[in-house]
Amino acid sequence: MKKKVAIIGAGVSGLAAIRSCLEEGLEPTCFERSDDVGGLWKFSDHIEEGRASIYQSVFTNSSKEMMCFPDFPYPDDFPNFMHHSKLQEYITSFAKEKNLLKYIQFETPVTSINKCPNFSTTGKWEVTTEKHGKKETAVFDATMICSGHHIFPHVPKDSFPGLNRFKGKCFHSRDYKEPGIWKGKRVLVIGLGNSGCDIAAELSHVAQKVTISSRSGSWVMSRVWDDGYPWDMVVLTRFQTFLKNNLPTAISDWWYTRQMNARFKHENYGLVPLNRTLRKEPVFNDELPARILCGMVTIKPNVKEFTETSAVFEDGTMFEAIDCVIFATGYGYAYPFLDDSIIKSRNNEVTLYKGVFPPQLEKPTMAVIGLVQSLGATIPITDLQARWAAQVIKGTCTLPSVNDMMDDIDEKMGEKFKWYGNSTTIQTDYIVYMDELASFIGAKPNLLWLFLKDPRLAVEVFFGPCSPYQFRLVGPGKWSGARNAILTQWDRSLKPMKTRVVSKVQKSCSHFYSRLLRLLAVPVLLIALFLVLI
């Protein structure tokens, strides 16, 4: 008899989970509280309780070749960085193409998930849902939590003395939709993340004055990188990851800081992070530096206190006559339908083995998909997480002992502290993490074998973008089109921009080899510098 799996949420994580269950011969039932797939990317012009929310102008920060489902490339004419409506179109197309919609119960929120009385022997769960006021409970052999982590706003009001006296409007960035109503107003944005920078840059075109308050600063990256290519196709390579993790720390830190300052010197703009060498996820914004340069956005330190109409910053300066304060301060991790101790089993921190499995459960029949942050895209991560989880639920893969899993969590937390500091417990190193998950299911590319068998492909896999197709080259669920997708990914990235015929200066292959030479030159120079210094 097929094992029944309850999947909560029909965003990209939920769709990956449904598909993975079907690939492993499991029987999925997905519960989605809204009336459509897409999750975070399904735009609504109003705020819906219990659902993620985005603003009208949102574009992706990952490019199309790096954020697709591994066996389902985007159409050639799709732009590299998409408006949310184009991504929603792709997600819907994927769900239809893979015949996933029939496994989804829409407008059916999950109200509770509880262990069955005999959980210690069966690992089964009681899942209670509610539709049109009617509650139903069903028993499942396993559950996959795919409801995301952009639902419950984190607004640290206690950290801002006097905020209760402030007479202007005050709300979280989750409630922001479009800039028109703030025309001619004075706006303070608290937080220097992606949402805060997007909102501030957009508001600066209509507001009288926009100020961003940041406690610790941030690196601000452009989506456009070397030679005008998408940043992630140039930066997220196995070669660069190898250098980052194996060069001496001093050289690695110097190289990282140099990369971050390649576009502009952050110190001059008041943006430089307090700790410049931490690998916290940078902000992606192509417009913010220009808005600062034009005087339309001002960067300030943390707010010391509020008055009725103003904000006093820690440097003693003030922003007066404020009409609105927008808290772009992130989200909390919460699953109200689930016992909180399952996900946060220690010190109120997310405690999951490899970011997926609660280690303390008697049976490994619950998986959390998509509860990670990374410099890489979410879709390929959720695909690998779901494939691994489905194999564990089926019994094809097994997990280590509880002690071994907890030891691994402790080790990973130490590594995260080194690279990302103490503020981001769910951030991870993209390629290292993807390879780790892929190795569990036999989907990790064998580079040595590739260099012997298919040198052309091997060079692109190692030196080129670590695109999702790499994880469907081998193993269960391998895709026959993966090799061609990898070898033609640069062409697809250029296709939507070639709307005017120009004379060719050089062929794409010469571009590849020139890029390869530049990449090889950097570590040679760094190693030479290191040898001179010692």
From Swiss-Prot:
The enzyme's E.C. designation: 1.14.13.148, 1.14.13.32, 1.14.13.8
Pfam families with a match to the protein in the record: FMO-like (PF00743)
GO cellular component, one term: endoplasmic reticulum membrane
Cofactor(s) required for function per UniProt: FAD
Protein residues bound to NADP(+): 60-61, 195-198
Other facts: Trimethylamine is a bacterial metabolite found in some animal odors, and is a repulsive odor associated with bad breath and spoiled food for most organisms, except for M.musculus, where it acts as an attractant.
Role: Essential hepatic enzyme that catalyzes the oxygenation of a wide variety of nitrogen- and sulfur-containing compounds including drugs as well as dietary compounds. Plays an important role in the metabolism of trimethylamine (TMA), via the production of trimethylamine N-oxide (TMAO) metabolite. TMA is generated by the action of gut microbiota using dietary precursors such as choline, choline containing compounds, betaine or L-carnitine. By regulating TMAO concentration, FMO3 directly impacts both platelet responsiveness and rate of thrombus formation.
Entry protein name: Flavin-containing monooxygenase 3
Organism of provenance: Mus musculus (Mouse)
Lineage: Eukaryota, Metazoa, Chordata, Craniata, Vertebrata
